Design a protein with these regions (language model features):
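N-terminal accessory scaffold of Fe(II)-dependent oxygenases
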Residues: 1-178, 188-359
Length: 359
């Protein structure tokens, strides 16, 4: 359906509508529209992992272009610089675009319980209307329940809202307000009135481990046909290799000359990357040899006094993430397969009321 058709239906009186439309995937980055050119995400996004990497690549390209202006360089050096510029441009052209979603939702829309792809953080600005969020913190127990629920291959016996009924917090967002949803927060969204939202997803340097954890789970679900490719943060592995090569390497190589402000945070980032970065067919910006080189160089750059030797893993793929455990069988010895529960306002109301929340 074209966006013009969505707008036409959106402007139809509610009692005349034959569909409840909830447009979630309309991303405008690079479209050249007035919105694309003029909209700026919240300042927090400037501190995101992607923004830092993007700015680094821009500066790196400028440095290479300046070096190419030097007529005294050898032909061999010139070829190296041209190839380097080409690789930078390829990465910049393929850079992920998740910061300019225009979300159009009719009253009655409901987005079921989820964690945003790759455990990315979210900003959510209400331009018009109202949204009601139900959020649960990513505690160890809550994430265990969520992962088992998402990867259940034999049916879900109970809706996760009811399973976690005491964990939900109700947050109402109205026109003019901006919400920030941190990494890995479990949430559902109800739309009580027609709404227009501008939102975006972004990664944070202090959440690398969480982001890898959920990305690996999503990749496992993709392999099993439980998730489609369009639901992934498509360039996640590429971004992580590029961030390691361009930013993390620079921080580690220059520790003595340019010490970072927060050494413990850098240690955590390095440890998270060291324990999770692995060769991947999805890391298409890099050949298999380049991926191996980056992983090995990361190990070589880690100061010897940071981690005990036994804490530094070998260069290998992480252990596979298991799908949900086998579920109980019924009296006939067959697994019970219960379809996804119907999401209705009345049912959501009952579940939240039991948790002490009311519409």
């Amino acid at each position: 359906m074209k966006i013009s058709e969505v707008i036409d239906r959106f402007e139809t009186a509610s009692h005349e509508r034959d569909l409840c439309i909830n447009v979630l995937s309309n991303e405008e980055s690079g479209s050249g529209t007035k919105f694309d050119l003029e909209f700026r995400p919240p300042r927090l996004v400037e501190e995101s992992l992607e923004k830092k990497l993007e700015q680094h690549l821009i500066r790196k390209k400028e440095t290479v272009e300046k070096a190419l202006e030097d007529n005294s360089i050898t032909e061999g050096r010139k070829e190296e610089l041209v190839e380097q510029k080409k690789r930078i441009e390829q990465q910049m052209n393929a850079f992920p675009k998740y910061l300019k979603f225009v979300i159009v939702s009719m009253s009655g829309s409901f987005t079921n319980v989820h964690v945003d792809f790759s455990a990315s953080s979210v900003f959510y600005h209400m331009f018009r209307g109202t949204k009601i969020f139900y959020l649960a913190q990513p505690t160890e127990e809550n994430m265990k329940i969520y992962k088992n629920y998402e990867t259940s291959v034999k049916g879900r016996k109970k809706w996760i809202v009811e399973v976690m009924q005491n964990e939900w917090k109700r947050v109402v967002i109205t026109a003019g307000m901006t919400a920030i949803i941190p990494s890995e927060y479990i949430h559902a969204v109800y739309t009580p009135e027609d709404s227009i939202v501008v939102g975006g997803n972004f990664l944070m340097e202090n959440q690398i481990a969480r982001q890898f954890e959920l990305s690996r789970l999503e990749e496992k679900m993709l392999d099993k046909g439980m998730l489609d490719y369009g639901s992934l943060y498509k360039e996640f592995n590429n971004v992580m290799f590029s961030y390691t090569e361009n930013i993390l390497f620079e921080k580690l190589a220059n520790l003595h000359e340019n010490p970072v402000d927060d050494m413990e945070e850098l240690k955590e980032q390095t440890s998270a990357m060291m324990n999770n970065l692995s060769k991947s067919d999805l890391a298409t910006w890099y050949s298999e040899e380049d991926q191996e080189r980056i992983i090995q160089k990361l190990k070589d750059l880690i100061p010897v006094d940071w981690f005990p030797v036994e804490e530094i893993p070998e260069v290998e793929a992480p252990a596979p993430i298991p799908l949900a455990a086998e579920e109980a069988e019924n009296g006939d010895g067959e697994p019970e397969a219960v379809p996804e529960p119907d999401v209705t306002r009345a049912r959501l109301h009952r579940a939240c009321k039991r948790a002490g929340e009311n519409f």
